[in-house]
Amino acid sequence: MQFPESWLRSLVNPSIGTDELAHRLTMAGLEVEETEPAAPPFTGVVVARIVDIAPHPDADKLRVCQVDDGSGALLQIVCGAPNAAAGLTVPLARVGAELPGGMKIGVAKMRGVQSSGMLCSARELGLSQDHAGLLELPAALRPGTDIRAALDLDDTLFTLKLTPNRADCLSIFGVAREVAALTGTPLTAPAAEPVPVTIDHRLPVAIQAPDLCGRFAGRVIQGVNARAATPEWMKTRLERAGQRSVSALVDISNYVMLEVGRPSHVFDLDKIGGDLSVRWAREGETLELLNGQAVALDPKVGVVVAGEQVESLAGIMGGEATSVTLDTRNIYLEAAFWWPGAIAGRARRYKFSSEASHRFERGVDYASIPEHIELITRLILDICGGQAGPVDDQCVNLPVREPVRMRLARCHRVLGVAVERAEVAQIFTRLGLPFQEQGDDFVVTPPSYRFDIEIEEDLIEEVARVYGFERIPDVPPVARAKMHAQPEARRGAHAVRRLVAARDYQEVVNYSFVEAAWERDYAGNDNLVRLVNPIASHLSVMRSSLIAGLVAIVRHNANRKQSRVRLFELGRVFHRDPQLADGPLEVAGVRQPLMLAGVAWGGAVEEQWGVPHRQVDFYDVKQDVEALFGARADALRFVADRYPALHPGRSARIELDGQPIGWLGELHPQWTQQADLHHAPVVFELDFEALAERRLPAVRELSRQPAVVRDLALWVDAKLPAQAMLDTVAAAIARDPQLSVVQDAQVFDVWREKPVAGQTVTEKSLAFRFWLQDTEVTLDEARVADCIARIKDALVAAHNARQRA
């Protein structure tokens, strides 16, 4: 909300400067977003009057003006403005004046004629962008008066950023009320004595929807002059508040709305075809608004109708059919209390907002309607003339403001400072909050303009605002604290992040709420955790997997010509679990495990001249996953399985010590195509708890003896996983003390016979390499051969293997 400081100080004028006033308002919760001067700095510009004007002897478009600047002698000034005329009052930049932008005015000759100064347009003074002609000033101004004083150009424009709960401050008077409370300065309320009722004409009104309109007041005014000029003081205030002048009747309505926060509407009485009714709209009804927009109505929108013709969108905007024009002679002035819930969101449905709807959907004072009707009427009669009829004021359903109790002890506990009882009483008095003291409690009845006071904490906030947040001492919280030792065998979240980052992955953070389609496509989840009030319609469910969010970021980067992307996210997912009860960090029925997910797309390594380019594959990312587990990687198993997000033939379930902990694989071809990626990303998702546990290293003496390497090739069933044979080897080493010298075993070759037409290959050859080493003695050939034989026997027994010749 924007307004000039001078308007505010006409209602309350504390003895503090502009900067201090802005600071006080901001610290009280009315954030002053910006202050700027009403006009840029300039000097030497005065009010002047053109006494005589003559054509320039040597230029058709220039004229020679004789100007009275109040000095007693006429100045000769050459001017080319089309509106220059004798008798016109205009700004004059005298010789030596400095205009905005640093322009200095001196004596000059223009086509041979001396010019001692410059007559100015509004743009040359930085007041507006209008440069079509000279700025025309009121004729009542005295020549020689400094233009800054004459037009009050040393004013300051305040821009407030109000929170939605402070609807009472959406007016100059509302802000003035706050300033008076903060500074103790007397407040002058805008008011007008009831105007004489000189006609008895009434327009009948029926309120058919009390849940829409709680109070409706109006009066007929006849014989107005709609062509009357809006006073300069009113136009200036409106312009400095960001409103353009339209016509006297419209300007008066806007002026009162800005000054006291009362939206009103002026109907052209002669265009109203019947009695007025206030009701909810009906299906099929339409209305052309004042902004030229035609809207289709429905029963969720309130309207004012004349007979059966809709004339106004209740609390939002009037209709074009009954709008006032310069030819209007008779008007109906209306002001009403519209229930905030009946107005909220209605204007946004039609993709616009109005000053009226902005106020009504937050709450407008319902008790001061008659006084404001009188204020508007007085301005209309003073400016446009006319005769006023009686006020028709109907109250059918007004809010009932329940008293709110504030315990003084509770106030002290919340604020952390003991505000004296007498000071609390003084604060409530200055804020205009009627109260009763009951023991140590204050029972406050919220005024009709304070829709934000409903609970005890609201009153405590009022005390804090006026008492002053800066007066509340900074006291560190005192609480029992106990440092818990982190087990050495457990890693924290930051340690895991560092591990993943060391594998060349970059961390991202996605929303926890996602599209419902993502859950269906990527996680196969039909039991969704839906949001009651999503921040956006497409972010309506809680995620049960991190994979979809990572794929979306890969797509985002691919669309921006990135060729290699490696990302990870550590975050919570959400699963339905009827067995889960409420807890300090749990919500009943929803399990929230912490998961780690990663995605690799593009080159396996950064582009480099000495390394052939190839796309990242399953085994590259499998190696990354194994590296994250360190010494526990030997307990990992990658079991071929299917997952909705992954390629059915290139995905694996990850198990640790026999328990499933996640998934690894290429993205499903369907989702790869849907994301418009030219090759499939490889993704993984792991349970964080499995990663957090780690095996501590066991220190042992480094052997001084040479290692012996032996190979063993065996024929086995073609469908037998190599990991099954490695598990058999590990089990044999664990149970046979003679095999303790076997330090490592790896598969180094897989070979299959070339298939013959019509026959299926049933066997494959797996070649294993073993490293044997003793810490005490050098192994002889007999011991090595015995170890290899024992391993071969175990494999033959377990898998029906036979040695390859």
From Swiss-Prot:
Reactions accelerated catalytically: tRNA(Phe) + L-phenylalanine + ATP = L-phenylalanyl-tRNA(Phe) + AMP + diphosphate + H(+)
One Pfam family, short name: B3_4
InterPro entries: aa-tRNA-synth_II/BPL/LPL, B3/B4_tRNA-bd, DNA-bd_dom_put_sf, Fdx_antiC-bd, Fdx_antiC-bd_sf, NA-bd_OB-fold, Phe-tRNA-ligase_IIc_bsu, Phe-tRNA-ligase_IIc_bsu_bact
Keywords, comma-separated and alphabetical: Aminoacyl-tRNA synthetase, ATP-binding, Cytoplasm, Ligase, Magnesium, Metal-binding, Nucleotide-binding, Protein biosynthesis, RNA-binding, tRNA-binding
An example Gene Ontology CC term for this record: phenylalanine-tRNA ligase complex
Segments traversing the membrane: none
GO process annotations (BP): phenylalanyl-tRNA aminoacylation
Entry note: cofactor: Binds 2 magnesium ions per tetramer.
GO molecular function: ATP binding; magnesium ion binding; phenylalanine-tRNA ligase activity; tRNA binding
Residues holding Mg(2+): 452, 458, 461-462
Location of the FDX-ACB domain: 703-804
Residues in B5 domain copies: 399-474
Major location (coarse): cytoplasm
Localization annotation: Cytoplasm
EC number(s) from the headed UniProt entry: 6.1.1.20
Annotated tRNA-binding domain residues: 39-148
Cofactor(s) needed: Mg(2+)
Tree of life domain: Bacteria
Oligomer status and interactors: Tetramer of two alpha and two beta subunits.
Recorded family membership: Belongs to the phenylalanyl-tRNA synthetase beta subunit family. Type 1 subfamily.
Entries under PANTHER family matching the protein: PHENYLALANINE--TRNA LIGASE BETA SUBUNIT (PTHR10947:SF0), PHENYLALANYL-TRNA SYNTHETASE BETA CHAIN AND LEUCINE-RICH REPEAT-CONTAINING PROTEIN 47 (PTHR10947)
Name of the featured protein: Phenylalanine--tRNA ligase beta subunit
Organism name: Bordetella parapertussis (strain 12822 / ATCC BAA-587 / NCTC 13253)
